[in-house]
Regions:
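A short structural micro-motif
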Residues: 76-78, 116
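Short helix-coil-helix linker/hinge
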Residues: 59-70, 77
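N-terminal interaction/assembly modules
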Residues: 1-61, 122-133
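Residue-level detector of well-ordered alpha-helical segments, enriched
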Residues: 9, 66-70, 109
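A short glycine/small-residue-enriched secondary-structure motif
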Residues: 71-73, 88-89
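DNA major-groove recognition helices of helix-turn-helix
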Residues: 95, 102, 106-124
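Helix-turn-helix DNA-binding module
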Residues: 78-104
């Protein structure tokens, strides 16, 4: 899979997580797991949502609140429309201006979140494969 395709797939997972209402901070982990189980039909979709949740938890535990804020501001746009060419860059620019930081800083935070997601997703898939044996 090409790098751009993988990036787009990860962004779709983050956006779906928000669209399903799983970004609600008042939900307990058990409620989130139950909601994922109820809302996601395929095993792949469940793994994607669990990976997003685990990414956010890991970032929160590492006190990377600025990265979580970037994810929520840029990826958790609950509008149902498909992303157009400049949606993400517009949201990044807006967030950079709000936080008085450089756009590259926001992009680095988002890249870090995608890398964490990718590693978590790979590990969860390996664990699931082992359980299926």
């Amino acid at each position: 899979m090409q790098k751009a395709d993988k990036r787009n797939e990860i962004i779709r997972s983050f956006r779906k997580f928000a669209r399903l209402g799983l970004d609600n901070e008042l939900l307990s982990p058990i409620q989130i797991y139950k909601k994922i189980d109820f809302l996601c039909i395929s095993k792949r979709s469940r793994l994607d949502m669990l990976s997003v949740y685990d990414t956010l938890r890991l970032l929160w535990l590492n006190d990377e609140k600025s990265t979580i804020e970037a994810i929520k501001s840029v990826y958790f746009d609950k509008k149902a429309h498909r992303l157009t060419k400049h949606d993400i860059s517009t949201q990044v620019l807006s967030l950079a201006q709000e936080n008085h930081c450089d756009e590259r800083t926001i992009y680095r935070r988002l890249e870090r979140a995608r890398q964490i997601y990718e590693k978590i997703r790979e590990r969860e898939e390996l664990l699931l494969d082992e359980l299926d044996r």
